[in-house]
Every structure is written in structure tokens, then in C-alpha cells.
Swiss-Prot record:
Gene: nhaA
Major subcellular location class: membrane
Protein family (similarity comment): Belongs to the NhaA Na(+)/H(+) (TC 2.A.33) antiporter family.
Key words, A-Z: Antiport, Cell membrane, Ion transport, Membrane, Sodium, Sodium transport, Transmembrane, Transmembrane helix, Transport
Name of this chain's protein: Na(+)/H(+) antiporter NhaA
Annotated organism of origin: Cutibacterium acnes (strain DSM 16379 / KPA171202)
Length: 420
């Protein structure tokens, strides 16, 4: 959020007023990036323990029907829509007044994000096309970067780093989210029902019209969101697309302090970070680790493609994309950022997790063995990326802090060069 917003006039709130300056609510704790990452990690550990110590009870709970969907489906197709609604709000803000609103500033991380999706998908496909027992259907699994987890790690280890490093990672992850949303919409929509889709579009359009006419009572939007989500689910298009669409059509106003995007994010983000994502992790990350699964992590094309895609593909794609953009355009890295910072961020971007888990369920909907193997690979790659990327960024932060203390400067890379 830009500093200019501090002087903007207030507007009537959508739901309730934001937390006062001298008050700390539980919801404020859940808005903290570190808290969200730790809850996700705790839910992942709990899922692994439950799946391996109580394998039958874990799968019984996941497959328990609750109305029209199983609990696992409620997590992936229902609750995760809230997470994508937050992603849509983030995208809207960035498009209007953030890093994606200034093409010159956004070009490097956007190209880096695209290359950081193409290279992992290419590496996975290469492993699985060349192998006789390969399964190319999982090509989309290593494409995503988990924005919540990556920013949580950066918040823990990023002391001393230039603010532009966080801005680069944020823009990269948001562009990555947009790419993942497009992939889900284009490649994982099945059995399209035009009438249900028309109903979803009508709800999304109604949301946009109400936003245009400044309808600020948030409770009017709740049934529209639910009906639009249900129509999207029944249409054959993945239901999370509805969340993104609602977020993108939410109004944001540069001259208003408490605009609708801020209000919705302020109210919904604690539920997303504190309930939705941890519960999705609990329902998705429960991999039964047998000797066969462990062996497959090091030998099977699915596992090799995912791990190499997230660890190597992200680094190669993001670094190469950034380098070529800086070399052949007038775009530059942020103030104080050097290429070693970009490489460290590229390693951290190998944290796939939330969207990679969703891609796994979409890629192998009927083969639990392949899905478990893929999820175990995502977990291992994400863990390695978090450790390696965190260590590298911590080292970079110390280097920046030492240079600042000595009143010396590490010269940023100028546009058109990529040799630092």
C-alpha cells in the first residue's frame, strides 16, 4: 500500500471499522505474514502425522460427505475460493495503484514470473515424456509459488534487505498467482455447462454493478458470493475462479483511505490465513509415507520432475527472465537490489505448496498413489526451497546491513546488464 493513502479521506466501512491503533485483536495476529506461514506449517505437520499414525481415520474424515461435497472437496473447491478471493483483491490493488500499475517497475518480475512457470513445467514434462513410466499430466504442479509461505519466510529472515526485494517477490508471486489462475481456468475445466456458467457470470456481473454504484453494505454481497461460487462449481469451471473474479471486480479508490478492497481484505484475510489455508493444508498434505513413496521421491519421473522443477526450474527461469529483461529493455531492478538477491528470491520461489497441492488434486483426481507421490514431492521441494532460500536471503540481509553500517554501497545493476 502506498504512503499517499495516509492522507486520503475516509469512507463508510463495508462491515465494521478496522482495528483501532491502540487495540490488538486476534484477527490482527492472523493478518501477520509470519503467523499465517506458521499455521500452514503446523497444519502440514499435523496432516502428515495424522495420515501416518491414523491412516484410515484420516481418509475416512476427508471422504466424509457433508451435504453435496466431501470434506476434502469443501476444502479444495469451497474454502479455497476465499483464498483466491484475497488473491483477486491483491491483484486489483496492484493493477490500480501498486507494482503492476507501472509497467516499467513491473516488467522484470512479471517476465521472471512467466519464465519461472514455463521452465518448471518444461523440466517436469521432459522428465515424464522421456521416461517410459512417466505421467506428463502433472506438468502444472511445479509452476506455482506459494505467496503466503514465501512472504512468511522472508519476514523471518529478511532483516537488512532492501524493501525492493520484498516488492520484487510480492510482484513475482502475484503475477505467478495470475498465471496459475489462467492455467486452472483453461486446462482444468471439464464438462462445461453453459447455463450454470451463465448464472455464475450473472452473479459476478451483479457484484460489479453493486460496486460501481457504491453499495457498501457487505452483507448484500455474501449471498451473491455463495450463489456465484455454487454456479461456478456446477458449471465445470473450477470454483476458485469465482473468488478471483469477485476480487478483481471489487472497487478500489485511490483518494479514499478505507476503500472496498482494503475493507474486504481486512475482514476476510484473517479467515483465509487462520482457517482456510491451514484447513486446506490439513486436508491435502496428509501423505502416507511408505517405503515405496520414499523410494519414488528419488527415482520416479513424477517426483523428479516436481522437485527439479521447483528447485532448479524456478531458479533458472526467474534468474534468466530477469536477466534478459534487464539486458534487452530499459527496465531495471529495484533500488539497492543486486543479482545475488534475485537468485536468492528465485530459490525461495520454489516453495509451491498451496496452489501446487491444488494442481496435484486436479492433475491426478482418480489416482491416489500418484497424488500422494506428487504431494510428498511438493512438500520436500518446498521444504528445501524454504531452507535454502531463507539461508541465502539471511546472508544477503547481513551483507546489506554491513554495507549500510560502513556507509558503503553495492552498486545496483544498471539496465542492460546482467553480469553481477
Amino acid at each position: 500500500m502506498t504512503d499517499s493513502r495516509k492522507n486520503k479521506r475516509p469512507r463508510k466501512s463495508i462491515l465494521r471499522p478496522v482495528t483501532g491503533p491502540n487495540a490488538l485483536h486476534l484477527s490482527d495476529i492472523f493478518r501477520n505474514e509470519t503467523t499465517g506461514g506458521m499455521l500452514m506449517l503446523a497444519a502440514t505437520v499435523a496432516a502428515l502425522l495424522w495420515a501416518n499414525l491414523g491412516h484410515h481415520s484420516y481418509h475416512f474424515f476427508r471422504e466424509l460427505a457433508l451435504g453435496p461435497l466431501t470434506i476434502e472437496q469443501w476444502a479444495a473447491d469451497g474454502l479455497l475460493t476465499v483464498f483466491f478471493f484475497i488473491a483477486g483483491l491483491e491483484l486489483k490493488r496492484e493493477f490500480v495503484e501498486g507494482s503492476l500499475s507501472r509497467p516499467a517497475d513491473a516488467l522484470v518480475p512479471i517476465v521472471a514470473a512467466v519464465c519461472g512457470m514455463v521452465f518448471p513445467a518444461g523440466i517436469y514434462t521432459l522428465f515424464n515424456v522421456l521416461a517410459s513410466d512417466g505421467h506428463p499430466a502433472g506438468w502444472a504442479i511445479p509452476m506455482a509459488t506459494d505467496i503466503a509461505f514465501a512472504l512468511a519466510v522472508l519476514a523471518i529472515v529478511g532483516a537488512g534487505l532492501p524493501q525492493a526485494v520484498r516488492a520484487f517477490l510480492l510482484t513475482l508471486a502475484i503475477a505467478d498467482d495470475l498465471g496459475s489462475i489462467i492455467v486452472i481456468a483453461v486446462f482444468f475445466s471439464t464438462g462445461l455447462d453453459i447455463w450454470w456458467l451463465a448464472g455464475a457470470i450473472a452473479c459476478i456481473g451483479l457484484w460489479g454493478v453493486m460496486q460501481h454504484f457504491h453499495v457498501d453494505n457487505g452483507w448484500w454481497y455474501v449471498p451473491i458470493f455463495i450463489v456465484g461460487w455454487w454456479c461456478m462449481l456446477r458449471s465445470g469451471v473450477h470454483a476458485t475462479i469465482a473468488g478471483v473474479a469477485f476480487g478483481l471486480l471489487t472497487r478500489t479508490e485511490e483518494d479514499v483511505l478505507d476503500d472496498p478492497v482494503d475493507r474486504w481484505q481486512h475482514k476476510v484475510e484473517p479467515w483465509s490465513a487462520g482457517v482456510v489455508v491451514p484447513f486446506f493444508a490439513l486436508m491435502s498434505a496428509g501423505v502416507h509415507v511408505s517405503g515405496k513413496t520414499f523410494l519414488a521421491l528419488w527415482t520416479h519421473p513424477i517426483s523428479l520432475g516436481i522437485v527439479c522443477g521447483l528447485i532448479l526450474g524456478k531458479v533458472i527461469g526467474i534468474t534468466l527472465g530477469s536477466c534478459l529483461t534487464a539486458r534487452f529493455t530499459s527496465a531495471e531492478l529495484g533500488r539497492g537490489v543486486v543479482w545475488r538477491d534475485i537468485i536468492a528470491v528465485a530459490v525461495l520461489a520454489g516453495i509451491g505448496f498451496t496452489v501446487s497441492m491444488l494442481m496435484t488434486d486436479l492433475s491426478f483426481p482418480k489416482n491416489h498413489e500418484f497424488a500422494d507421490e506428487a504431494k510428498a514431492s511438493v512438500l520436500m521441494a518446498s521444504f528445501l526451497a524454504a531452507i535454502l532460500g531463507g539461508a541465502m536471503l539471511h546472508h544477503r540481509g547481513k551483507s546489506h546491513a554491513m554495507r549500510q553500517t560502513k556507509h558503503s554501497h553495492e552498486v545496483p545493476v544498471a539496465a542492460g546488464t546482467c553480469n553481477d
